[in-house]
Swiss-Prot record:
Zn(2+) binds at residues 203, 247, 258, 263. GO terms for molecular function: DNA-binding transcription factor activity, RNA polymerase II-specific; I-SMAD binding; metal ion binding; RNA polymerase II cis-regulatory region sequence-specific DNA binding. Pfam families: MH1, MH2. Residues 350-570 form the MH2 domain. Residues 150-273 form the MH1 domain. Residues 121-134 have a biased composition (Pro residues). This is Dwarfin sma-4. It comes from Caenorhabditis elegans. Residues 115-134 are annotated as: Disordered. InterPro entries: Dwarfin, MAD_homology1_Dwarfin-type, MAD_homology_MH1, SMAD-like_dom_sf, SMAD_dom_Dwarfin-type, SMAD_FHA_dom_sf, SMAD_MH1_sf. Keywords: Cytoplasm, DNA-binding, Metal-binding, Nucleus, Transcription, Transcription regulation, Zinc. GO terms for biological process: anatomical structure morphogenesis; BMP signaling pathway; cell differentiation; dauer larval development; determination of adult lifespan; nematode larval development; nematode male tail tip morphogenesis; parturition.
């Protein structure tokens, strides 16, 4: 049952209307239905307004009145629905058609149309060709607003192979989750991958981990190398990737690393990659050409009595090319194959700590006993007798020339850091505050130049290795060997056995002071960083920091220098 004011689809009995498509009056015979006139007219008007089939019919909403007489204009009318007189393109009742219900009437008030309008033909509808759907329409429509599962599924379709599918899936899902809150960068990644780099995109950054590596499914690798292998080059190594100029994230950025695979290019490299080359850890024997004659030290020996390469021949062929020692970071070291000789005597202290504010040492040198304390805590406490518990309280150290920057930084030290000396000679660190570390071992694992960057650590309950005694021993052995070779070659040139032009190049940074800094010390800055991307270029410009001198590697360095001196004097 229809009620007043409700619209319905057009359905009339003996309905007459004007069809402008044929220019003639049409009478449609329909089965009689019990619709009231008001509902019929409102339904025709609804049909006209909704479907726009008859553009000449008036398009206006029904009007509601309160049972007052309505005077129609002087136009021809149709007295009833069963008899027709002059018709001007629409139905016009002879008197207002109404359905009274609570004194409410629905009246249709049309406006007559002219004969020119009735006879005019509507323009033909132009044919619109459908837009072709690109083959990768699903990828194009994928945005950062979609679910992580859908985005990951689309990105997996563009992998280049070469990696385990389960590893690829987990690596992509992990990346998408990290970028879900950075929609602009996630959109940039989707665009870069789905367009194969044809569309320029911005940097896609993730937070740099504490050791600079990405761990997925039990495997570790450098983040930008991992995703470059997934989406571009399955067999690429770290040393073959070069950052493009459009990448705005520097390689030594302390917090972020760009993993956009199209912000790097691959270059041909004949260098031997470091430990970052593969996601798999391979324990292959170290070649003798890298270890020299002192490669794997016999466990029965104490210290090598003579330095390596005793079979030095002072003569050089006139056309012999200059021997250039490869860069240290480019030569792989299998630390499991290196044996560190036992010390000739036990040490009383395993480290000593000096506290600095800017370039000024504050207080006395703090020494940590090797027998009583295997770990040391450096915090912002006020206990002046904390050394009895293996604790250095920086809050108890006064400085009459303390700057405002140092005062503010000291407030955030809190529980500080904890350094632990392990039985194998390695040193690990646990951070309870924001710190930046200078460590030669961390530089080696990251493949960067020694002492060139600060490694950022955030408060974390896990400990991380910041020094490896096997690595330090091997590196000091190499530099000492390089220095000895240069001395012998220089002596041969002076004696006339070879010209100076063919003298082997000495390995850089082979000086004692530099070896001590790179392999025997760790520096930790609290709160503030330093480096090329900061106003503070060196650690001596930071407000408060400590320098930890490790006595065990110092002992090794001293013995190596003694052996070199004995060889040089013999």
């Amino acid at each position: 049952m229809f009620h007043p004011g409700m619209t319905s689809q057009p359905s009339t009995s003996n309905q007459m209307y004007y069809d402008p498509l044929y220019g003639a009056e049409q009478i449609v015979q329909c089965n009689p239905m019990d619709y009231h006139q008001a509902n019929i007219l409102c339904g025709m008007q609804y049909f006209n307004n909704s479907h726009n089939r008859y553009p000449l019919l008036p398009q206006m909403p029904p009007q509601f009145t309160n049972d007052h007489p309505y005077d129609f204009p002087n136009v021809p009318t149709i007295s009833t629905l069963d008899e027709a007189s002059s018709f001007n393109g629409f139905l016009i009742p002879s008197q207002p058609s109404s359905y009274n219900n609570n004194n409410i009437s629905c009246v249709f008030t049309p406006t007559p149309c002219t004969s020119s309008q009735a006879s005019s033909q509507p323009p033909p509808t132009p044919t619109v060709n459908p837009t072709p759907i690109p083959p990768n329409a699903g990828a194009v429509l994928t945005t950062a607003m979609d679910s992580c599962q859908q985005i990951s599924h689309v990105l997996q379709c563009y992998q280049q192979g070469g990696e385990d599918s389960d590893f690829v899936r987990k690596a992509i899902e992990s990346l998408v989750k990290k970028l879900k809150d950075k929609r602009i960068e996630l959109d940039a990644l989707i665009t870069a991958v789905t367009s194969n780099g044809k569309q320029p995109t911005g940097c896609v950054t993730i937070q740099r981990s504490l050791d600079g590596r990405l761990q997925v499914a039990g495997r570790k690798g450098v983040p930008h190398v991992v995703y470059a292998r997934i989406w571009r080059w399955p067999k690429v190594s770290k040393n073959e990737l070069v950052k493009l100029v459009q990448c705005q994230t520097s390689s030594d950025h302390p917090d972020n690393i760009c993993i956009n695979p199209y912000h790097y290019e691959r270059v041909v490299s004949n260098r031997i990659t470091s430990a970052d080359q593969s996601l798999h850890v391979e324990n292959s024997p170290m070649k003798s050409e890298y270890l020299g004659d002192a490669g794997v030290i016999d466990s029965c020996s104490d210290w090598p009595n003579t330095p390596p390469d005793n079979n030095f021949n002072g003569g050089f062929a006139p056309d012999q090319p200059q021997l250039v020692t490869p860069i240290i970071s480019d030569i792989p070291i299998d630390l499991n194959q290196i044996y560190v000789p036992t010390p000739p005597q036990l040490l009383d202290n395993w480290c000593s700590i000096i506290y600095y504010e800017l370039d000024t040492p504050i207080g006395e040198t703090f020494k940590v006993s090797a027998r009583d304390h295997g770990k040391v805590i450096v915090d912002g406490g006020m206990d002046p007798h904390g050394e009895n518990e293996g604790r250095l309280c920086l809050g108890a150290l006064s400085n009459v020339h303390r700057t405002e920057a140092s005062e503010k930084a000291r407030i955030h030290i809190g529980r500080g850091v904890e350094l632990t000396a392990h039985a194998d000679g390695n040193i690990s660190i646990t951070s309870n505050c924001k710190i930046f570390v200078r460590s030669g071992y961390l530089d080696y694992t990251h493949g960067s130049e020694y002492s060139s960057k600060a490694h950022r650590f955030t408060p974390n309950e896990s400990s991380f290795t910041v020094f490896d005694i096997r690595w330090a021993y091997m590196q000091m052995l190499r530099r000492s060997r390089s220095s000895n070779e240069a001395v012998r070659a220089q002596a041969a040139a002076v004696a006339g056995y070879a010209p100076m032009s063919v003298m082997p190049a000495i390995m850089p940074d082979s000086g004692v002071d530099r070896m001590r800094r790179d392999f025997c010390t760790i520096a930790i800055s609290f709160v503030k960083a330093w480096g090329d991307v900061y106003q503070r270029k060196t650690i001596k410009e930071t407000p408060c920091w400590i320098e930890v001198t490790l006595h065990r590697p110092l002992q090794i360095l001293d013995q190596l220098l003694k052996n070199s001196s004995q060889f040089g004097s013999s």
